[in-house]
């Protein structure tokens, strides 16, 4: 059915009103009323949030989400609170949060000023930069080696913007292919349909660790931009932000955060039991003391 311009405008207006209403609501009150909290997860953001089995997300960010749930249950005195899980992508995570479908998104989301116009962010829990995953046999070692080649980038990510800008500045003439998720971009490189997969370096190390043939892949290039990751929550909800930040502050001050980091970034991770072996960055060490939610520009 083809909608008239008037009907289309009306529907868009309703959707915008619903999103505005959701943004203004008290998340804790919503959870209390519904007796349910809905957590978002990613399907292939290794080691932050990814599937170990169908419908079973695991990872560093999943454990952060679970710590928030424990505090919500405590504050609401609801030990049997229902915890619903919903997969999200880079494209739909913000709309699903602002319209009230999900209550918290902890995955591999960059905290930046542009997104801060639509959502709020908790204390930063990781820092990363854009690099490229390639096949070792390609002999690609830096960005200049990609001139005129196809690269696969997940649509809806800051990496897409960073690489487009770099491509224009350096006149690399890249053929950029947008993909639905990280796993799709990895497959394009593995099958030689793309020369590289630019993405946050930690996600590339995680995907490489769980790839079919990790030894055939490598992460190359200088980091184009260092950015923080943080959990997303709705804007204008200081009570819920205080709860989430309070949970993270407790984890960071008690040393529990560092134990979680060691588990997911230093030791072997499921399902391939390969270790990423990534020491904690200076930026993250500093933020364990600063407890900052400062965005990237």
Walk through the language-model features, giving the residues of each.
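Extended ligand-binding regions for polar small-molecule ligands
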Residues: 63-71, 144, 149-150, 155-157, ...
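Ligand-binding clefts/hinges and TM-proximal coupling segments of bilobed small-molecule sensing domains
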Residues: 158-176, 215-219, 248-297
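Acidic, polar ligand-binding/catalytic clefts
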Residues: 66, 77-145, 286-293
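A ligand-binding cleft/hinge motif common to bilobed small-molecule-binding domains
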Residues: 92, 106-117, 161-169, 188-191, ...
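Sec/Tat signal peptide C-region and signal peptidase I cleavage site
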Residues: 17-22
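Bilobed "Venus flytrap"/periplasmic-binding protein-like clamshell domains
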Residues: 38, 43-47, 57-74, 110, ...
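Extracytoplasmic small-molecule ligand-binding "clamshell" domains
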Residues: 24-26, 30-105
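Periplasmic-binding protein-like
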Residues: 43, 126-137, 201, 209-248, ...
